[in-house]
Amino acid sequence: MSLIISLIESAQGHYPLVLLMVFLLTFTKSCALVSLAIPGTSGLLLLGTFASASLGHFLLMWSSASLGAIGGFWLSWWLGVRYRHRLTQLRWLTAERLARSRLFFQRRGLWAVFFSRFLSPLRATLPLVSGASGLPLRSFQLANVTSGLLWPFLLLSPGALSLSLW
């Protein structure tokens, strides 16, 4: 435990870099282009420990993570709008994965966008599918922003609370 505490204390001196790391992690984890290759959930749980110093640190980290998550989903939605006719030509997007995402979106609509943030296989594809399906930006952003605020909060909180209670 002392090793973890010393790592956290040394990172506190480079807090802007930690915030940038959190932003990039959540952005890439929420972006259709690279989401499948980035292990973001465990990284956010670990990075939450850096926010244990104070409420201010937690709020900054949560803001940074939320901006990254919201931006990554928005970019994915835009790519779906822009390249909707070419989604089946993407090598990393299998026909089965695309079909599952479309089915989930058709069944659940806007809720599918919200819940896909919390379901790793859908997080990579559902914003893309929702954009390709013609979901209006305003509706998409409603689900995007609410889930983009909640998801990082739920992942950062355990780490922040664990060391503050220790």
Give the ranges of each region predicted by the language model:
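Membrane-interfacial helix-loop-helix
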Residues: 1-22, 52-141, 157-166
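Alpha-helical transmembrane segments of multipass membrane proteins
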Residues: 23, 27, 46, 128-129, ...
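Transmembrane alpha-helix interface/packing and boundary motifs in multi-pass membrane proteins
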Residues: 23-42
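Transmembrane alpha-helical core residues of multi-pass small-molecule transporters
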Residues: 25, 68, 146-151
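Hydrophobic membrane-targeting signal helices
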Residues: 27-32, 150-151, 157
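Hydrophobic side chains within alpha-helical segments
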Residues: 32-33, 44, 120, 126, ...
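Central hydrophobic cores of alpha-helical transmembrane segments
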Residues: 40, 144-146
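Hydrophobic alpha-helical segments within and immediately flanking transmembrane helices
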Residues: 42-49
